[in-house]
Amino acid sequence: MSGLPIATNLYFDAHFHRHGVKLLPNEFYTTREDMVLVTVLGSCVAACLHDPIGRIGGMNHFMLPDDGADPSAAASESMRYGAYAMEVLINELIKAGGRRERFEAKVFGGAAVLAGMTTINIGDRNADFVRRYLALERIRITAEDLQGVHPRKVAFMPHTGQAMVKKLRVQAPDVAAREAALAREAVDPHGERAPRVRPRVELFGTPAPKAQAKPRIELFGMRATQPATRKQEA
């Protein structure tokens, strides 16, 4: 199992007027600096963790590799990889001074961004995993924007815990190309797709199951004059 690398794509974000880091798939980043962590998600998920008292936070970006196992089996290689991606983020935050019992989570992604992805079900598996993992670890999810058909651009302020999300076009070229590659990687070594869980029908705007509260997620990159856009601070 390979290590999860620290994101190194540093830049100055003109939209948020602060330094930022762009996370690619299978990267993570933690900091207590007043900066922004940004990533673009298709079927992958990003977990944003924050210690509101320590004012430290971090983000990861990962997907479960498909080993053909039953996704409900805790011992499968996929689950071990997902757990590792989460443990790296949690442990790095603790090493930097965060307290596990204070961590709050905001989770994003898990979309079906290609026509065939609802059959492959990668996004659903990623979304289900991150919810289940955080529940087992007793880390409260304070906001989520998971599943559906739209890629997402996510911005997270680790110093304050504020998160913002922007829905992208369903067939955003860069995301679609990346997701097509991920779909190919979901084919087993013998060239046939491994057995999947039950197929699902994507409904536009499907609500997250058993939401604990209204998601405190702000939409960014939208015109303020649009009456249908409701902004909420995360």
UniProtKB/Swiss-Prot annotation:
One of its GO terms (molecular function) is protein-glutamine glutaminase activity. Gene3D superfamilies: 3.30.1330.200. It catalyses: L-glutaminyl-[protein] + H2O = L-glutamyl-[protein] + NH4(+). Keywords: Chemotaxis, Hydrolase. Its EC number is 3.5.1.44. It holds the Pfam family CheD. It is an enzyme of class 3 (hydrolase). GO terms for biological process: chemotaxis. The keyword Hydrolase applies. Belongs to the CheD family. Probably deamidates glutamine residues to glutamate on methyl-accepting chemotaxis receptors (MCPs), playing an important role in chemotaxis. This is Probable chemoreceptor glutamine deamidase CheD. It comes from Burkholderia mallei (strain ATCC 23344). The gene is cheD.
